[in-house]
Design a protein with these regions (language model features):
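Blade-level signature of beta-propeller repeat domains, shared across WD40, Kelch, NHL, RCC1
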Residues: 123-148
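A general secondary-structure boundary signal
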Residues: 87-89, 112-115, 130-133, 137
């Protein structure tokens, strides 16, 4: 979970079962469907639901198809990455990449992936100096990304 830097809204990444990775912008009292509605499937390939929404179920703000195995997320708030400021970064366990998404209000658009991570991305955070730290498993390490 991360707090949007200007709206104060809580944004949450949801690693679905087999597929069904989502970003949800949390609203008080909203039901996001789990475990009855999902874009993914059970690991034994059985269907969780016939659809991913129903009356009273909030649709995800964004979902990845195919699944990236979404993990930690963060917003870029410092000027050190000027072209990325205001963007959302998401770690990918299955993709083994860092995913940058452009955010316009509540609209999320994939923009690019950062290659060369070489491991499952568990978490991403921006440091006070504006650099980005990426926690990677297999092998365990912390990468520091700085603007050129």
């Amino acid at each position: 979970m991360v707090i949007h830097p200007t709206t104060g809204a809580i944004w949450e990444s949801e690693h679905g079962p087999k597929g069904g990775d989502e970003i949800n912008i949390i609203a008080s009292g909203a039901n996001y469907g789990w475990p009855f509605y999902s874009l993914g499937m059970n690991y034994d390939n059985t269907i969780i639901s016939q659809g991913h929404t129903a009356a009273g179920i909030a649709a995800p703000s964004f979902s990845w198809t195919p699944s990236i195995g979404v993990s930690g997320i963060t917003f870029i708030t410092y000027n050190s990455f000027k072209a990325w400021k205001g963007n959302l970064l998401a770690g990918g366990l299955a993709s083994q990449k860092l995913h940058r998404c452009i955010v316009n209000g509540t609209t999320i658009t994939p923009a690019e992936t950062v290659e060369g991570i070489n491991g499952r991305v568990r978490h991403v955070a921006q440091a006070p100096d504006g650099s980005v730290y990426v926690a990677v498993e297999g092998p365990g390490r912390i990468l520091k990304i700085t603007a050129q």
